[in-house]
Swiss-Prot record:
PANTHER family: NADPH-DEPENDENT 1-ACYLDIHYDROXYACETONE PHOSPHATE REDUCTASE. The gene is vdlC. PROSITE patterns: ADH_SHORT. The active site is at Y153. Substrate binds at S140. Belongs to the short-chain dehydrogenases/reductases (SDR) family. It comes from the Bacteria. This is Probable short-chain type dehydrogenase/reductase VdlC. InterPro entries: NAD(P)-bd_dom_sf, Sc_DH/Rdtase_CS, SDR_fam. It holds the Pfam family adh_short. Keywords: Oxidoreductase. It is an enzyme of class 1 (oxidoreductase). It comes from Helicobacter pylori (strain ATCC 700392 / 26695) (Campylobacter pylori). NAD(+) binds at residues 10-36.
């Protein structure tokens, strides 16, 4: 087999948020499958697990437009196509809608939504060059059901859901598939970032007691959360499948929550959700 033939047979994946959690697990599994992986993350080169002959680690803040443009220019100089794009970069802002500073809201959307849009724009020329290429956007159950005191995170994921649906429609003529991955809680750095920081609410905030009760509840939920590996296995399996669905809800409890949201009247659901999340406050 000639060098050119080998190059054409090499599958290529680009992954954001690749140094931890779901992104890292996807990178490792695709490397095991023989993919050439471009691992993009703020600290990708510091991740020892990514030291692999087929992996090129790139340190980047995906919300930096100029850096992102340069990275994809370099990738495009080496690759003619991309088989799989996995958008896994993201984080959560926890707090009440009223008390969360607007600067934090803008940062939330910058990473979770606007940066992803730019990644897709830069990657599409490569994706269009490969039949049956796929884009996996990491959403959340919060993209379908807004969570108490995770309003801005939920809003960023709702935006991602609408964007992905539109993108899927637009890319159909180019044979580029778009898939939303909607897991429930996943054990990763996400909960550490969201729940370990000081609350935006002051002690005299009207939301302080409920915010602390919700934080305690969510932290407990993450003790029995899905593993990043379980979610990554689903993504990698789908990346090698010919046909995929528009979205995949991952986790039985997640499916139950969405079912309740869709079946119950909004007032009933709201009361039930608050009762469950704030139960520890009432017990105190």
């Amino acid at each position: 087999m000639g060098v050119g033939e080998k190059k054409e047979s090499q599958k290529v994946a680009i992954i954001t948020g690749a140094s931890s959690g779901i992104g890292l697990e996807c990178a490792l599994m695709l490397l095991d499958q023989g993919y050439k992986v471009y691992a993009l993350s703020r600290h990708a080169t510091l991740c020892v697990a990514l030291n692999h002959a087929l992996c090129e680690s790139v340190d980047i803040d995906v919300s930096d437009s100029n850096a992102l443009k340069e990275v994809f220019s370099n990738i495009s100089a080496k690759e003619k196509y991309c088989d799989v794009l996995i958008n896994s970069a993201g984080y959560g802002v926890f707090g009440s809608v009223e008390d969360t500073p607007i600067e934090e809201v803008k940062k939330q959307f910058s990473v979770n939504f606007f940066a992803l849009c730019e990644v897709v724009q830069f990657c599409l020329p490569l994706l269009k060059n490969k039949p049956h290429s796929k884009i996996f956007n990491l959403s959340s159950i919060a993209g379908r059901v807004s969570m108490l005191f995770l309003g801005h995170y939920s809003a960023s994921k709702h935006a991602l859901e609408a964007y992905s649906d539109a993108l899927r429609l637009e890319l159909k003529p180019f044979n580029v598939q778009v898939c939303l991955i909607e897991p429930g809680p996943v054990k990763s750095n996400w909960e550490k970032t969201a729940f370990s920081v000081e609350n935006f609410e002051s002690e005299d905030s009207l939301y302080a007691l409920e915010v602390n009760a919700a934080k305690s509840f969510y932290s407990g939920v993450y003790q029995n959360a899905l593993s990043p590996k379980a979610v990554a296995q689903k993504i990698v399996f789908l990346s090698m499948s010919q046909k995929i669905k528009a979205r995949y809800l991952i986790g039985l409890k997640t499916q139950l929550l969405l079912a309740l949201y869709q079946i119950l009247p909004s007032s009933w659901y709201d009361s039930l959700f608050r009762l469950i999340v704030l139960k520890r406050k009432r017990d105190a």
